[in-house]
Amino acid sequence: MQSRLSDWLVKHELVHRSLGFDYQGIETLQIKTEDWDSIAVISYIYGYNYLRSQCAYDVAPGGFLASVYHLTRIQYGIDKVEEVCLKVFVSRNNPRIPSVFWIWKSADFQERESYDMLGISYANHPHLKRILMPESWIGWPLRKDYITPNFYEIQDAR
């Protein structure tokens, strides 16, 4: 069984890989970085008009980083929405993915947080800068190979 989007991608010979279904029956698809721009636009045109969430994680120390997109197809008069999860894996040596801010505005802060915590650079994002850590912070705190700095700021508790 495949999601409707997966069926459509197969029919139009767009390469992707199914990673299975979650407990709610939502399919997760792996998308190649070089295809992400076009598949994101196709997903929107196909009706996935709402980016429910975007997050990222470090797959393994020294391994790939993943950017995850939970898309929802919301239509007036339809009680059950259709959902799909898309994952884009990138090398930690060059973690660059096209931004989807221009398709789903809700990606703005979410992509910025993924950049700030894991160092994934979202190409063509209009405000890509740190959102949680100070601009002077060195490194990416949620990477599994991150080494915590050897300093602690002592504040006066008076």
From Swiss-Prot:
Gene3D superfamilies: NADH:ubiquinone oxidoreductase, 30kDa subunit. Signal peptide: none annotated. It comes from the Eukaryota. Its EC number is 7.1.1.-. One of its GO terms (cellular component) is chloroplast thylakoid membrane. Keywords: Chloroplast, Membrane, NAD, NADP, Plastid, Plastoquinone, Quinone, Thylakoid, Translocase, Transport. It is found in: Plastid, Chloroplast thylakoid membrane. GO terms for biological process: photosynthesis, light reaction. It catalyses: a plastoquinone + NADH + (n+1) H(+)(in) = a plastoquinol + NAD(+) + n H(+)(out); a plastoquinone + NADPH + (n+1) H(+)(in) = a plastoquinol + NADP(+) + n H(+)(out). It is an enzyme of class 7 (translocase). InterPro entries: NADH_DH_suC, NADH_quin_OxRdtase_su_C/D-like, NADH_UbQ_OxRdtase_30kDa_su, NADH_UbQ_OxRdtase_CS. It is a peripheral membrane protein. GO terms for molecular function: NADH dehydrogenase (ubiquinone) activity; quinone binding. Belongs to the complex I 30 kDa subunit family. NDH shuttles electrons from NAD(P)H:plastoquinone, via FMN and iron-sulfur (Fe-S) centers, to quinones in the photosynthetic chain and possibly in a chloroplast respiratory chain. The immediate electron acceptor for the enzyme in this species is believed to be plastoquinone. Couples the redox reaction to proton translocation, and thus conserves the redox energy in a proton gradient. This is NAD(P)H-quinone oxidoreductase subunit J, chloroplastic. It comes from Dioscorea elephantipes (Elephant's foot yam).
